[in-house]
Swiss-Prot record:
Pfam family name, one: Ank
Organism superkingdom: Viruses
ANK repeat spans: 36-65, 69-100, 101-128, 129-161, 166-195, 199-228, 232-265, 270-297, 301-332
InterPro entries attached to this UniProt entry: Ankyrin_rpt (IPR002110), Ankyrin_rpt-contain_sf (IPR036770), PRANC_domain (IPR018272)
SUPFAM superfamilies tied to this protein: Ankyrin repeat
Record's protein name: Putative ankyrin repeat protein FPV232
Keywords: ANK repeat, Repeat
PANTHER family: FYVE-TYPE DOMAIN-CONTAINING PROTEIN (PTHR24118:SF100), POTE ANKYRIN DOMAIN (PTHR24118)
Species per Swiss-Prot/TrEMBL record: Fowlpox virus (strain NVSL)
Length: 482
């Protein structure tokens, strides 16, 4: 079957089909040693030979048959080129060890999902160089993969079949593939988006691990559970901040957070939050804090992100700054946390390091100064730091003192921008509420049957306050549609 496998890459459809007919009576379909498929349909799919795949399906070849590697044709088309199998083929064909050029070319083929490189190697041209490999990659058309998967699915390929050894579905393999259309077609045809493998990894775990942003987005569209834990006790969020994936995965982390993944979920084995794992990366740490990551959570070894960071002196001072800024802000916003074990651990850690204590003192000093800037007997500029201040801001946003003190916020380097952002948000929402009130007034013109028009303005305002921004916008749009 080795000869047929090589033929799948190099020869005409007519020649291949004749060879299949010739070998049919002595077909070898199982071999626990070989890393290449031994079933003709599986070979054709692995060689990305569209014409032969179509011909074999028309002949009635079993689209859901598993080979000795436990793979169906659907698993194969969603996988990267068979690196180990190609090494086996070239070694057997040439009767020698692979050259460094061949080793590198095969790795290049797998990384770029490019079957053309395999074809080039099988031609056995001794004058080829790695530059030829890179040029070859530019010309590869992965739409062939898409055409093959559509063909397999049209002939009844089952998206739910799992490999016997690792319990992986085709979607697990597609989630590692740069061609996001493979995953999309599988989901259209009913693939289970949260199906676990033997390690309880979902397709989302695989997509995040391989930094496959397009597939991450598609999986989310089909309802992927981003809080699903694998057998190592980690979610896709934990994977996205890990050191192993330090490259090119900030955007994936942001996508997961925007979609509402649980930012403070702890791994089930060591109790790490994503924030614990992000102390090596200022960008990721800042993003997690922006989405509500709690720096006072203890892992199972009773360590907070800060207590872990101070033990490693190589971390940038900005890591300590961002964590302590947030710890102090949370203590101001939620005084009850001062009695929690995590906060006490952080304070012990901060007070034990002069550099950290000076940061904490600066935070508390700035908050105290903001509290001293009074807007009314009840409210100060520091109230704009609180999460539960929306009603307060709504009531006093037109206070002239706010505009006056707004320009002074640049002199508050730690929390000034938070205050300014809260003020801007409150003003935008106030204008939105006023616009919605006007639209409602215009829609419900004076009539004895309409009670809205005769309501006091303050009551109208309180009613509109209960609506979110999207509902307010829809109400304004409704005026122009009516």
């Amino acid at each position: 079957m080795l000869k047929l496998y090589i033929s799948m890459f190099l020869d005409s459809t007519e020649h291949i089909l004749k060879e299949i007919n010739r070998l049919q009576h002595k077909e070898q379909r199982t071999n626990g040693i070989s890393c290449i498929p031994l079933i003709p349909l599986h070979q054709a799919v692995e060689a990305r030979n569209l014409e032969v795949v179509e011909a074999l399906l028309e002949r009635g070849h079993n689209v859901n048959e598993t080979d000795h590697r436990y793979l169906t044709p659907l698993h194969i088309i969603c996988s990267h080129p068979n690196k180990i199998g190609m090494k086996e083929v070239i070694a057997e064909k040439t009767k020698r060890d692979l050259s460094s050029y061949e080793e590198r070319a095969i790795s290049e083929a797998c990384y770029n999902n490019d079957i053309n490189i395999f074809k080039m190697l099988l031609l056995n041209d001794g004058n080829r160089t790695i530059d030829d490999v890179q040029l070859c990659t530019i010309d590869y058309d992965d739409s062939i993969d898409t055409k093959i998967i559509k063909l397999l699915l049209a002939y009844g390929a089952d998206t739910k079949i799992k490999t016997e050894d690792k319990l992986k579905t085709a979607l697990h393999y597609a989630s590692t593939n740069k061609n996001y259309k493979l995953a999309e077609y599988l989901l259209i045809y009913g693939a289970e988006v949260n199906s676990p493998d033997i390690g309880n990894n979902s397709p989302m775990h695989e997509a995040v691990r391989h930094r496959n942003e397009d597939v991450v987005k598609i999986l989310l569209q089909y309802g992927s559970n981003t809080d699903h834990m694998n057998s190592c006790g980690t979610t896709p969020l934990h994977i996205s901040v890990g050191r192993v994936l330090n490259r090119n995965n900030y955007s994936i982390l942001k996508i997961l957070l925007e979609h509402g993944t649980s930012v403070n979920i702890q791994s089930s084995i060591l109790g790490f939050t994503a924030l614990h794992l992000s102390i090596h990366s200022e960008d990721k740490l800042n993003l997690l804090l922006e989405y509500g990551a709690d720096p006072n959570i203890l892992n199972f070894e009773k360590e907070t992100p800060l207590s872990m960071a101070v033990k490693v002196t190589r971390y940038d001072i900005n890591i300590y700054n961002r964590l302590i800024y947030n710890i102090c802000l949370r203590a101001f916003k939620y005084p009850f946390i001062k009695t929690t074990e995590g906060y006490i651990k952080n304070m012990t850690c901060i007070n034990g390091y002069p550099k950290c204590k000076s940061i904490k003192d600066a935070c508390e000093y700035e908050i105290k100064n903001l509290e001293s800037i009074k807007l009314s007997p009840r409210f100060s500029m520091a109230d704009f730091l609180k999460d539960d201040n929306s009603l307060m801001m709504d009531k006093i946003i037109n206070n002239d003192l706010i505009d006056y003190y707004y320009s002074f916020m640049d002199s508050f380097p730690i929390y000034g921008n938070i205050v300014k952002k809260s003020i801007d948000t409150a003003k935008d929402r106030y204008l939105l509420i006023q616009g919605a009130i006007r639209s409602m007034d215009n829609i419900t013109f004076p009539s004895q049957r309409v009670s809205w028009y005769n309501m006091p303005l303050e009551i109208k305002h309180d009613i509109m306050y209960l609506l979110d921004d999207k509902s307010l916008c829809n109400l304004i749009v409704a005026e122009y549609d009516s």
